[in-house]
Amino acid sequence: MRRFALGRPFVSGARRLSRGGLIDRSRSIRFRFNGKTYTGHPGDTLASALLAQGVRLFGRSFKYHRPRGIVGAGAEEPNALVQVGEAGYSTPNLRATQVELYEGLSAQTVNGWPSLKHDVGAINSMFSRILPAGFYYKTFMWPRSAWMRYEHFIRKAAGLGRTPEFPDPDIYDKRHIHCDVLIVGAGPSGLIAALTAARSGARVILADEQAQFGGSLLSASSTIGGTRAVDWVKKIVDELRTFPEVKLLNRSTVVGYFDHNFLTINSRRTHHLASGDSDPRMSRERLWRVRAGEVVLATGAIERPLVFDGNDLPGVMLSSAVTTYIRRYGVAPGRTGVVFTNNDSGYQAAIDMAWAGMKVVAIVDSRRFPGASVARETEALGIPVYKGHVISSARSGSEGLNRVELS
């Protein structure tokens, strides 16, 4: 068994890079998180802005209230649920990785009492042996009339957002629309599909949940035909905008796919704006009801986490998320790190970490024979590679993740 000490904790050493990313460093945005004021930049999400300032604790687990940090960089994020806004503008259970930063944004975590750092609910872990899965459905059954009182405290302890207590001042609308081709996802495949259909004269709708089109290319360091990936995306999108029969829907999630190519799309039209900055006549959200001749699903993929003891600790992140924070948001999520992988993408994450000035202690590859090209690149950077090994456990101290063990 090998042990690696990470030195200064992984996430507490996070910092903003002086180069790279798609953020506007010339402007600063002030916002509040859990009552404390922070600053970020246009192009940041709430998660990236907080990571850049060393925030590592974003929530508590559902049952034992174990500390939780950022794992992903988008819709796959399971931990960083926040309540955004106040009074009638309050919205619960949004992912910090999807909340775009704007001036005056106010957010707070949805659990942890009296505070996120000092959560009384963490005492539950001491009684884990007598709190099996679903214990509350078997334990609090008598007297039956008391269940509603039990439920109030059980749900509060679980920790989800609060339903707004004031009327919603915003407006919402819906639209019906027909198209020849609906493309779901605006990554490289979706963009090419949209451009090909548009050039044929078809009526096209391109929908993507992110603020910017490009998908994985927004955090890619590669080139396409000698052009930087982000510049290639801009070129394609600019051409798409010249077609009158093409509708581009960013910040829009396809939420339903029904018979006969009937789909529904939820467009978040003003979520990225402060309440006083949006046109009061403009709807906050719009539901598109689409009848499509053909549907192209170009939704990409989500990385699956590897399993080991302690993989839920703050500081354990998906390699794709690390790359995204470095390349798209200009944030190094730590000073040191270990990469655990079973495919070549982990090596690219290690290369990105080294580019960001992080010390990559090791790459742990469960395969005995990794891809030759990525192996050569990491060897040139002097990064040790442990082939045919796995991480068996991760441990943390008072300030964050500080040690991993291999087997």
Give each language-model segment a name.
Residues 2-407:
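Residues forming the flavin
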